[in-house]
């Protein structure tokens, strides 16, 4: 009793001091409106209050007593994350990509004073590639939901690259090119991320006037909402890549012709040398045109070397360091020429991905002539050194990036592949080790940069919480809270299931979590890896055994569809591998028998996934077609969307393989069937015909899976 009285005396004192300070902008209204979009009129009963940031970092408090709920925060996103935390922990409720489990308990359940400060100034989200693998054809309705979700997870620094090409077009017109020359430069929408990073030109293009205009309008809506919520979006900047027509008009400039991804030269980029006066001129124009359209911004992303090495003599170290020094200085100056207050943001992915090129002296050279307070490095993939590169984490190799500000980030998804993978133990602890490291340098942020969204929701829920935690998270405790909020209960079998998931699929990160039937034959370039162990399959059986108790939960049912589909697909995988073995040993009848077993199981998988809210080709195609304004444009966008998740282009075949209804039935199954015929050499021709032919849904959803 005494403890309670003291606690509320402290609360009252806090309230008194809070009332003496007000933020420069209204942080309450945007947060309240967002919460209303989640729970409707119930939001009217919530009290909202502003509190001062702590040491320049966001802080929030939650108090619920006698039916009165008060959310306090230092920013709109802090209040939104406070609401998300309260709903998850006190109301046992959750809203995710795949659905929701929202209890309507009123009055608001009591909840102890909950106070939390983020150890990070910035909490970053998205990946350049997300704008290809997930969002290329999204409309405002879908973007609004995603920005809401970001705020609920406490994100305050999202990437915002929509409409980059519309701005670039204006710049190139001012540089003397005509529209035809400019449009030939751009790829189709789903491949634009790689165009923006200088990896790819022309592929599946061009872009229409209508597309450019619509993207400008969409970006206005995106930025307006992000800014209302107090987010600090990262805008695109010029990275040195120019249209072929521009290179041809300036033969005296020594452009470097880059190579990437196994594409023919005509699709590869030309990059300006750093000593060209064009570099700063074009960079300045780009920032000016962007801000003329969208308003002032602080953070600008420019990546000139993503997964590409400069065509230089690697043995001449001094020449290499000199060139990198010049590039770093020129990129920085090209951005600040357009806005002196701008900060250059760059992805640190390539520093780890090509670690043999980016030794200490090379990265020091790139950074050497850029002021420490005018650059942020997103150390993108801290999960990859352990699981793929077999190196130390990049920030450790480079001593906390030599005084530059940096963000600790993960890449928990590649290509939008949606089978189960992720190292939960790492996600619950590795960033905390960085926070406490003596050589962490100027670590100011935490983030996640998935190439594809709408998958492995447990991973993103955990990462959201890590953005607000100075300590490692106890996964045993956290999983109980997660399951109770997601499913409405945590029976013993569920607990055992998740222990096994954490021991199997969620104990590691695979770059290419694909089944063999998704690649026809084993991919020797990018080795597919997926957990099919007995423990993993037992986890699915245990999860399914909770159906009677939890079947009223939408999220339980959706996860059940997903997990049982994996179970059946794993059985299909065994038959398919045997079919391949039979085929290689010329056992024709045995191969056909095992192939048919594979097909029968995969058809069951397809029927199940047709009832899942996310794992359907139908929605992917629908977004693409809805982005077109003419039949020709609709067909082109559909083909582009389907190409990305199948043949891709270059050496990226099946990189973005999806475990989706519609794709399994109409693409993966016919393709493996064709392989087991005398016409297997016609697979590429068949793929192209499927990609370029309009697809239509031919399967009825199962209402009660």
What kind of region is each of these model predictions?
Residues 2-11:
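Sec-dependent signal peptide recognition
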Residues 17-19:
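C-terminal motif of bacterial Sec signal peptides marking the signal peptidase cleavage site
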Residues 21-120:
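Contiguous, structured surface segment used for ligand recognition
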Residues 43, 94-109, 126-130, 151, ...:
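Catalytic-core regions of glycoside hydrolase
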Residues 120-139, 150:
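Active-site-adjacent substrate/metal-binding segments within catalytic domains
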Residues 517-550:
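C-terminal functional modules
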Residues 553, 557-606, 665-666, 671-699:
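Ordered core of a single globular domain
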Residues 700-705:
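Residue-level detector of conserved catalytic or cofactor/ligand-binding positions
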């Amino acid at each position: 009793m005494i403890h309670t009285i003291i606690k509320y005396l402290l609360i009252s004192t806090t309230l008194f001091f809070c009332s003496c300070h007000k933020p420069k902008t209204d942080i309450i209204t945007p947060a309240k409106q967002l919460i209303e979009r989640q729970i409707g009129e119930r939001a009217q009963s919530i009290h909202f209050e502003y509190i001062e940031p702590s040491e320049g970092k966001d802080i929030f408090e939650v108090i619920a007593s006698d039916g009165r709920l008060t959310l306090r925060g230092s920013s709109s996103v802090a209040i939104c994350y406070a609401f998300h935390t309260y709903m998850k922990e006190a109301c046992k409720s959750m809203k995710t990509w795949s659905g929701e489990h929202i209890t309507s308990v009123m009055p608001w359940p009591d909840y102890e004073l909950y106070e939390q400060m983020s150890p990070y100034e910035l909490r970053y989200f998205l990946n350049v590639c997300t704008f290809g693998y997930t969002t290329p054809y999204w409309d405002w309705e879908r973007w609004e939901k995603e920005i809401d979700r970001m705020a609920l997870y406490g994100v305050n620094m999202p990437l915002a690259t929509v409409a980059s090409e519309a701005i670039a077009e204006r710049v190139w017109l001012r540089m003397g090119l005509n529209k035809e020359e400019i449009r030939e430069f751009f790829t189709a929408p789903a491949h634009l991320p790689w165009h923006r990073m200088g990896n790819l030109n022309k592929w599946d293009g061009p872009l229409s006037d209508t597309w450019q205009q619509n993207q400008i309008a969409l970006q206005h809506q995106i930025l307006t909402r992000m800014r209302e919520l107090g987010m600090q979006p990262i805008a695109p900047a010029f990275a040195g890549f120019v249209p072929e027509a521009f290179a041809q008009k300036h033969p005296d400039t020594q452009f470097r012709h880059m190579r990437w991804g196994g594409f023919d030269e005509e699709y590869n980029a030309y990059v300006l040398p750093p000593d060209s006066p064009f570099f700063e001129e074009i960079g300045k124009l780009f920032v000016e045109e962007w801000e003329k359209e969208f308003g002032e911004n602080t953070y600008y992303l420019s990546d000139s070397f993503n997964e590409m090495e400069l065509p230089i003599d690697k043995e001449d170290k001094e020449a290499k360091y000199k060139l990198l020094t010049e590039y770093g200085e020129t990129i920085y100056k090209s951005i600040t020429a357009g806005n002196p207050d701008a900060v250059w943001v760059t992805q640190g992915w390539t520093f780890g991905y090509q670690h043999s090129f980016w030794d200490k002296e090379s990265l020091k050279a790139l950074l050497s002539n850029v002021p420490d307070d005018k650059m942020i490095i997103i150390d993108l993939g801290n999960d990859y050194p352990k699981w793929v590169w077999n190196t130390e984490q990049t920030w450790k190799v480079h001593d906390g990036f030599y005084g530059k500000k940096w963000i600790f980030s993960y890449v928990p998804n590649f290509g939008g592949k949606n089978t189960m993978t992720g190292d939960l133990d790492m996600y619950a602890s590795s960033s905390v080790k960085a926070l406490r490291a003596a050589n962490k340098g100027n670590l100011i942020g935490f983030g996640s940069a998935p190439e594809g969204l709408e998958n492995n929701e447990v991973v993103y829920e955990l990462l959201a919480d890590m953005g607000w935690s100075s300590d490692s998270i106890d996964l045993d405790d956290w999983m109980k809270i997660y399951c109770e909020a997601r499913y409405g209960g945590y029976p013993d079998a569920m607990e055992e299931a998740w222990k096994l998931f954490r021991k199997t699929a969620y104990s590691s990160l695979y770059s290419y979590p694909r089944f063999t039937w998704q690649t026809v034959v084993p991919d020797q370039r990018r080795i597919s890896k997926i957990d099919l162990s007995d423990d993993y399959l037992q986890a699915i059986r245990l999860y399914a055994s909770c159906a009677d108790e939890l079947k009223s939960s939408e999220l339980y049912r959706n996860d059940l569809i997903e997990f049982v589909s994996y179970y059946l697909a794993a059985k299909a995988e065994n038959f398919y591998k045997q079919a391949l073995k039979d085929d290689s040993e010329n056992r024709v009848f045995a191969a056909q028998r095992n192939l048919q077993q594979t097909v029968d199981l995969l058809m069951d998988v397809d029927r199940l996934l047709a009832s899942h809210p996310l794992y359907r080709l139908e929605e992917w195609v629908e977004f693409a077609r809805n982005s077109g304004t003419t039949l020709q444009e609709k067909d082109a966008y559909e083909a582009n969307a389907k190409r990305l998740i199948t043949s891709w282009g270059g050496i990226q075949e099946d990189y973005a393989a999806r475990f989706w209804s519609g794709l399994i039935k109409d693409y993966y199954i016919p393709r493996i069937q064709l392989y087991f015929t005398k016409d297997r050499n016609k697979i590429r021709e068949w793929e192209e015909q499927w990609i370029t032919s309009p697809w239509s849904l031919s399967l009825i959803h199962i209402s009660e899976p």
